[in-house]
């Protein structure tokens, strides 16, 4: 038996029986790490690859007199107010590597946002779930940005294809051309996000410019890759739903012979996670996008010869 240590990946969730993340019934693997910091992000716990802590006040039993976490933090990040409620110094907490508070809590009020898996451990989970897929399912790698852990992901993809498991990815495409091209050789289906076509507006709300993203999409569309690509746009009122931006997306798609897009209406489902991470959520007052407006946007794409799906209405 080889003594060589296997690659490990950091994963914050594995969801079985997913039906909106690619063809058929799928297992979706959420990998840690993301080069973007979208202000509306539904999974802000995924931004860093290294483990870090979240605190759920709803799960905490401080009102019932629980004190099991008292004195556990050796770094001075955890104190308590007069009501016994935990008060966290997130500037100290972000550098923690021992997580005594997590290990002490019976109620999962303190929890880690990442769990290590070896390549074989993750593939075993995927193979186990394959019994539920029938003939048209597979595995989808999401995040975060799964391409940030490209070495680990590459090994998992190779093992999946060894046993004919269909592979899909949900990605921002915000990685080097080299990494992007290497991984996509083993991808059968892809969702790639376009947040905004204007590079300055893109950076304002995501923290990065979109040049590399658009370059990777264009290169993929004009390559000999034979997988299926669906672009995705998280539609946010007042940010990327203008006639100008929609027109720019259509022009980009026509230029690159791209024929499918998925419009995802904005939601605030990740707001509680921001609070649990001690972060300010700037979109708390942002309203849901009007369904009639979404249908109007859909009609614009359809009128321009582009298959357009709203929400989870994808043509699987």
From Swiss-Prot:
InterPro entries tied to this protein: 4-hPhe_decarboxylase_activase, 4Fe4S_Fe-S-bd, Aldolase_TIM, BssD/PflA/YjjW, Organic_radical-activating, Organic_radical_activase, Radical_activat_CS, rSAM
Binding site for S-adenosyl-L-methionine: 40-42, 144, 193-195, 267
Cofactor: [4Fe-4S] cluster
Cofactor, how bound (note): Binds 2 [4Fe-4S] clusters. One cluster is coordinated with 3 cysteines and an exchangeable S-adenosyl-L-methionine.
Domain Radical SAM core: 20-307
Catalyzed reactions: glycyl-[protein] + reduced [flavodoxin] + S-adenosyl-L-methionine = glycin-2-yl radical-[protein] + semiquinone [flavodoxin] + 5'-deoxyadenosine + L-methionine + H(+)
Keyword flag Protease: no
Positions annotated to bind [4Fe-4S] cluster 2: 60, 66, 69, 105
Record: residues binding [4Fe-4S] cluster 1: 34, 38, 41
Keywords: 4Fe-4S, Iron, Iron-sulfur, Metal-binding, Oxidoreductase, S-adenosyl-L-methionine
Any Pfam family the entry gives: Radical_SAM
Boundaries of every 4Fe-4S ferredoxin-type domain copy: 84-115
GO molecular function annotations of the record: 4 iron, 4 sulfur cluster binding; metal ion binding; oxidoreductase activity
EC supergroup of this enzyme: oxidoreductase
EC number: 1.97.1.-
Keyword Iron-sulfur on entry: yes
Sequence similarity: Belongs to the organic radical-activating enzymes family.
Purpose of the protein: Catalyzes activation of 4-hydroxyphenylacetate decarboxylase under anaerobic conditions by generation of an organic free radical on a glycine residue, via a homolytic cleavage of S-adenosyl-L-methionine (SAM).
PANTHER family linked to this entry: PYRUVATE FORMATE-LYASE 2-ACTIVATING ENZYME, PYRUVATE FORMATE-LYASE-ACTIVATING ENZYME
Subunit structure: Monomer.
The protein's name: 4-hydroxyphenylacetate decarboxylase activating enzyme
Organism of origin: Clostridioides difficile (strain CD196)
